[in-house]
């Protein structure tokens, strides 16, 4: 059982340690804790006994353990605070014209990695929830073509493919017609299901040879099922993570899955501190926060760093970036949905 004073001591030690990265002694706490040095030492000993503090090898001071950071995140972290002193700099960073969603997400990721010194990942709306709103096929040459998908009337995904040997021009038109009739207006999850259930039967009515058509469907839609993900500060992993974690970030789709699995449907924010799960991120801290993408759903910002982070400062910064990012995205999508020639 941690008393109120012991919790104050733990919070203060974490605050000092994350700024100095030096063990903290009882004398450093006396100005802020209204108790004698002996009482503070006794409380520190009790916190150590409970596994929340640990001794330093080169000093008589104490530093927070992984369990101490976990306790702090669970009991003391304020998720609603804003870093008001940094609002201006963050707003200024977004004061530019962006031409696509990925550029806005990249700016948010770059900004957070500059502020934190950590690795940052930004995710678009979950692919399965996005809706196909337009489709076309562009012939590039005698044997190649490009499938062009528009999701949520704003995001474009392309897939180049080799036209099957037995395909005629009219077969490409059939393919385009089937996709437009059967898939437009449906979510990516629905489309994934239809490709495996309805499409095999439908193409038998339109094509003499069906095997290569099924394979073609699988190929051109594969990219649409992938996460839209941007990263910043991957090199920072070399300062606090092992090689396996660094190499894990060469697989963006797996990174996206790991981040989504760490944030439940009903959660808007979460902090994982060395949760010990079988993961390349098990020994790291992951701060995840959802942000609104107007008219479409929610995205996720995730900061990946060492356990000994200044969690409160990072949460404050993430909160500000989230709010400014949502404002910028609202303006971006309002422009997209308006009549271009009426916008001044």
UniProtKB/Swiss-Prot annotation:
Annotated disulfide bonds: none
InterPro entries, per database record: GAF-like_dom_sf, HrcA, HrcA_C, WH-like_DNA-bd_sf, WH_DNA-bd_sf, WHTH_HrcA_DNA-bd, WHTH_transcript_rep_HrcA_IDD
Protein keywords: Repressor, Stress response, Transcription, Transcription regulation
GO MF annotation terms: DNA binding
A single GO BP: negative regulation of DNA-templated transcription
Annotated family: Belongs to the HrcA family.
Role summary: Negative regulator of class I heat shock genes (grpE-dnaK-dnaJ and groELS operons). Prevents heat-shock induction of these operons.
Protein name: Heat-inducible transcription repressor HrcA
């Amino acid at each position: 059982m941690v008393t109120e004073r012991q919790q104050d001591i733990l919070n203060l030690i974490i605050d000092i340690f994350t700024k100095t990265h030096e063990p903290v002694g009882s004398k450093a706490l006396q100005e802020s804790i209204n108790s004698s040095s002996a009482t503070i030492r006794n409380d520190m000993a009790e916190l150590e006994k409970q596994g929340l503090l640990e001794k330093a090898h080169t000093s008589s001071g104490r530093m927070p353990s992984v369990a101490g950071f976990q306790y702090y995140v669970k009991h003391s972290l304020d998720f609603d605070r804003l870093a008001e002193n940094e609002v201006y700099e963050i707003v200024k960073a977004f004061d530019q014209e962006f031409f696509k969603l990925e550029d806005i997400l990249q700016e948010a990721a770059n900004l957070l990695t500059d502020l934190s010194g950590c690795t940052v990942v930004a995710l678009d709306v979950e692919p399965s929830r996005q809706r196909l709103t337009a489709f076309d096929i562009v012939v590039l040459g005698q044997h190649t073509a490009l499938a062009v998908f528009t999701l949520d009337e704003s995001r474009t995904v392309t897939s180049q493919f080799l036209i099957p040997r037995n395909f005629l021009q009219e077969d490409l038109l059939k393919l385009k017609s089937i996709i437009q009739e059967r898939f437009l207006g449906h979510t990516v999850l629905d489309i994934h299901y239809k490709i495996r259930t309805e499409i095999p039967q439908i193409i038998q009515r339109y094509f003499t040879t069906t095997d290569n058509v099924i394979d073609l469907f699988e190929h051109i839609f594969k990219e649409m099922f992938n996460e839209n993900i941007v990263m910043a500060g991957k090199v920072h992993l070399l300062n606090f993570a092992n090689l396996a974690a660094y190499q894990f970030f060469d697989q963006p789709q797996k990174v996206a899955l790991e981040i989504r699995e760490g944030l439940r449907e009903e959660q808007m924010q979460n902090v994982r501190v060395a949760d010990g799960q079988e993961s390349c991120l098990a020994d790291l801290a992951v701060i995840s926060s959802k942000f609104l993408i107007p008219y479409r759903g929610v995205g996720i910002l995730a900061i990946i760093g060492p356990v000994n982070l200044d969690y409160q400062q990072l949460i404050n910064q993430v909160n500000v970036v989230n709010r400014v990012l949502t404002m910028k995205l609202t303006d971006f999508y309002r422009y997209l949905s308006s009549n271009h020639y009426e916008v001044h």
